[in-house]
Design a protein with these regions (language model features):
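Hydrophobic h-region of N-terminal signal peptides that target proteins for export
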Residues: 5-14
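Positively charged n-region of N-terminal signal peptides that target proteins for export
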Residues: 1-3
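Amphipathic hydrophobic-ligand
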Residues: 42-49, 69-72
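Gly/Pro-enriched, hydrophobic low-complexity segments
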Residues: 115-163
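Short, solvent-exposed coil/turn segments at beta-strand boundaries
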Residues: 25-26, 50-57, 72-76, 117-119, ...
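An acidic-aromatic
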Residues: 53-98, 148-153
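A short, Trp-centered hydrophobic/proline-enriched beta-strand micro-motif
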Residues: 21-41
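Flexible, surface-exposed loop/linker segments and immediately adjacent secondary-structure boundaries
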Residues: 85-122
């Protein structure tokens, strides 16, 4: 009975964590993305906003250092590079990882390689890439990962006061 209780308790914790993650990404968010620039040994930062409309489409605005807008829908990502007046589209099947798809469609415990580290930290592994999530507070979520160029990235999402 003790082992069954522990298994049930672990499933309950991971379900609650997944649900908290899904609920978090329903909010309007501000974010800071930090990555290490290996060419000049410095940290590069991008600042922006994340929002979701009533049709579950996502809009990501990069405000600095470059002005870009990403529209994510069921077909893929439309990218507007405002400073260069360029627009391009990437189909869902051409997106190299599923993290954006998870954020758009929701994280589901049964489809994830999910590891609970503690009450506030967990790891999702997808195609041999690790994504580390940590709830810093109810209003702040941090994601750490290596990108497709094997550079360390850190994104801090914070809830905006308006929902």
């Amino acid at each position: 009975i003790y082992i069954i209780f522990l298994l049930f308790f672990n499933l309950l914790i991971s379900d609650n964590t997944i649900e908290s993650l899904n609920e978090f990404f329903k909010n309007n968010l501000e974010f800071v993305q930090t990555s290490f620039n290996t060419i000049n040994n410095s940290f590069d930062k991008s600042y922006g906003n994340f929002s979701r409309d009533l049709n579950n489409n996502i809009k990501i605005e990069i405000n600095s250092p470059f002005k870009e807008i990403y529209f994510i829908n069921e077909d893929g990502i439309e990218i507007h590079e405002l400073e260069f007046n360029q627009k391009r589209f990437i189909k869902n099947q051409d997106i190299p990882n599923n993290i954006l798809k998870f954020i758009k469609n929701g994280f589901r415990n049964e489809s994830l390689d999910f590891e609970q580290i503690d009450d506030f930290k967990f790891k999702i592994t997808e195609f041999e890439k690790n994504y580390y999530f940590e709830f810093i507070s109810n209003d702040t979520l941090q994601i750490k990962y290596k990108d497709n160029m094997n550079l360390d990235n850190l994104i801090n999402f914070s809830k905006q006061n308006d929902k």
